[in-house]
Amino acid sequence: MSEPNGWVELDVPEPDAEEFTGPQPVVAVVGRPNVGKSTLVNRLIGRRQAVVEDVPGVTRDRVPYDAQWNGRQFAVVDTGGWEPDAKDRAAAIAAQAETAVTTADVVLFVVDAVVGATDVDESAVKMLRRSAKPVILVANKADNSSIEMEAATLWSLGLGEPYPVSALHGRGSGELLDVIMDRLPEAPKIIEDRPRGPRRVALVGRPNVGKSSLLNRFSGEVRAVVDAVAGTTVDPVDSLVEIGGEAWQLVDTAGLRKRVGKASGTEYYASLRTASAIEAAEVAVVLLDASEVISEQDQRILSMVTDAGRALVIAFNKWDLVDADRRYYLDREIERELRRIPWAIRLNLSAKTGRAVDKLAPALRKALASWETRVPTAQLNAWLTALVQATPHPVRGGRAPKILFATQAGAAPPRFVLFTSGPLDAGYQRFVERKLREEFGFEGSPIEIAVRPRKKVGPGGRGKAHG
């Protein structure tokens, strides 16, 4: 029967329990009525098959659907809304949901992130704990970043990290599928191998610092025009080269002499192309001329990379021209001019002679690994608790704000959210970031830390975050 929203209700016979226990792993989707379970199922399987309507009780039976993710095959079981102490028809629906739990390999417990945890959700948690099945807590309807941050309050259910998802819009669904693949007890069948393409590297720097010379060093041919005249490269030149036994997609970019806003003519368009190359890359190699003073324009280029959130390797080129005196002054310049990015990986090399060029590939790998690092929430909060106990926030106005908990909101670059009882001093925020890097690395990668001060929850409802 056609529904008002244009979706079609399928007459699917109820499967036997044996169908859930074969070699294909099974994921059961459970939760109280109308939290968006069927919408999530449709998102996971990549097509509209589960019946969806914005009223409770549309799904009554447990219905399996075939699905795949990154070449892995599994089954998703949609269930009706679970309620404690249900009667008559609702009791039968709840029983079907409990059967799906007992026959599944992994359970997705879906909670409405907008409403938050309810008494029914807490009762469902007790049922899930009795099943002893692996449970992934899904905070659905996280349609924007504000709701996504609020979803972290669902830690109170005691099921571990809540994964914010918008089943309707697809937000967070890829990350959730990755988590599901990690939790399945047996490796799903590999349908096809989809190798990752070469990592993209942008070579950036002001004119005549040796970007094209370095590119040609790797490519083994005169791939980019090299001239002693500054600015001979205008268009980005892509080259697929092998560095350290691995293929890399290198983008050589026009040298930047001026701010993009102040450049004109050819320089203006070259600057825009360079900015686009940085955005398209995963990691940037910023070349500086080691024989010259670190300039304001060098720092602007570094800012372009960090503002874009890309992994960063700083290569001091023309090291063959550096004598002992220049090394002394360069060390002082690094301390003074690059103090805001002490986390950047630094190399001293010579594209002309080949000195230390072999160190670039390990540096790129390390920077990218840091860029993609994820810290488990439990580990993050255990570390943070110890840090705050050892060095609490200074008292201001007779009170000291507390860091309630933290979560990593994303990677590439790593992004963290601190939920606090009040605003944190800028100095304490820098202290937390420094200690976070000391503990977990992130060498070669920027990290972002957002602070979410919260009001106390009053008797009338949920608290709200400032900002």
From Swiss-Prot:
Keyword Secreted: no
Domain EngA-type G span(s) in chain numbering: 25-188, 199-372
InterPro entries hit by this protein: AAA+_ATPase, G_ENGA, GTP-bd, GTPase_Der, KH_dom-like, KH_dom-like_a/b, P-loop_NTPase, Small_GTP-bd
Positions with a binding annotation for GTP 1: 31-38, 78-82, 140-143
A single GO molecular function term of this UniProt record: ribosome binding
Domain KH-like: 373-455
Disulfide bonds: none
Residues annotated to bind GTP 2: 205-212, 252-256, 317-320
GO terms under biological process: ribosome biogenesis
Keyword annotations of the record: GTP-binding, Nucleotide-binding, Repeat, Ribosome biogenesis
Function (record text): GTPase that plays an essential role in the late steps of ribosome biogenesis.
Stored HAMAP family: GTPase_Der (MF_00195)
Subunit structure: Associates with the 50S ribosomal subunit.
Family, similarity comment: Belongs to the TRAFAC class TrmE-Era-EngA-EngB-Septin-like GTPase superfamily. EngA (Der) GTPase family.
NCBIfam families in alphabetical order: GTPase_EngA (TIGR03594), PRK03003.1 (NF002828), small_GTP (TIGR00231)
Protein name: GTPase Der
Annotated organism of origin: Salinispora arenicola (strain CNS-205)
This protein's encoding gene: der
